[in-house]
Regions:
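Mid-to-C-terminal alpha-helical segments outside catalytic/metal-binding sites
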Residues: 113-114, 118-125, 134-175
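Conserved, mostly hydrophobic/aromatic
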Residues: 25, 61, 90, 129, ...
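Active-site gating/metal-coordination segments in enzymes
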Residues: 1-40, 47, 70, 89-95, ...
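Short, well-ordered coil/turn segments that N-cap beta-strands
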Residues: 26-32, 53-56, 84-91, 120-124
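Active-site neighborhood of phospho(di)ester-bond hydrolases with catalytic His/Asp-centered motifs
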Residues: 1, 58-60, 91-93, 123-128
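Catalytic metal-binding/acid-base residues of hydrolase active sites
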Residues: 37, 63, 95-96, 131
């Protein structure tokens, strides 16, 4: 997992010195997790996907929208743009730490719905963000809230989001 937000340059992964490593990750069929906590990170992921069209990328924490401030426009545009790249996926995780005190699944629903609308259930996966998630909730409460946000999906779509998307992305053999 790449912690992009720990670097001063949000485009650092686009440096030529990273190119060969990214090519090898793609050749091995592996995926790259990217943390995006601001629009500049999301735009860099778009560039990364364009530069390495065979590289599977998952954007952790739905690019960390500021749920507590009900921030929407820039985040929604970034996610819609990311979704146009077929090798970019999104992880439904970490929203509780972006939601302030007293959050509920209703606070997250528009963000989840937007990602499902643009990425589809086959490119959205659940994640725990444990132990960081404990900063703004308990494990069971966060997990239950995440499941509530996908309750409207068909059983097949829920299977995608709950495990099949991650199984495909990370090449997990569950047999």
């Amino acid at each position: 997992r790449n912690l992009t937000h720990n670097y001063a340059d949000p485009r650092w992964i686009l440096q030529p010195s990273c190119g060969e490593t990214l090519t090898q990750i793609a050749k091995a069929g592996l995926g790259l997790d990217m943390v995006s906590v601001m629009s500049e990170h999301s735009r860099a992921i778009v560039e990364l996907a364009d530069a390495h069209p065979d590289l599977k990328i998952v954007v952790d924490h739905m690019a960390k929208p500021d749920v507590s401030a009900k921030a929407w426009d820039e985040w929604a545009a970034d996610m819609a743009e990311l979704a146009t790249r077929p090798t970019v996926y999104v992880k439904h995780s970490g929203l509780n730490t972006a939601s302030g005190q007293g959050w509920t699944s209703r606070d997250w629903q528009p963000y989840v719905d937007h990602c499902l609308e643009h990425f589809g259930s086959q490119r959205v996966m659940l994640g725990s963000d444990w132990p960081v998630s404990l900063l703004a909730g308990d494990y069971v409460g966060v997990w239950q809230a995440q499941l509530e946000t996908i309750a409207q999906l068909s059983p097949s779509e829920q299977d995608d989001v709950c495990f099949k998307t991650a199984q495909r992305f990370y090449q997990l053999d569950l047999s």
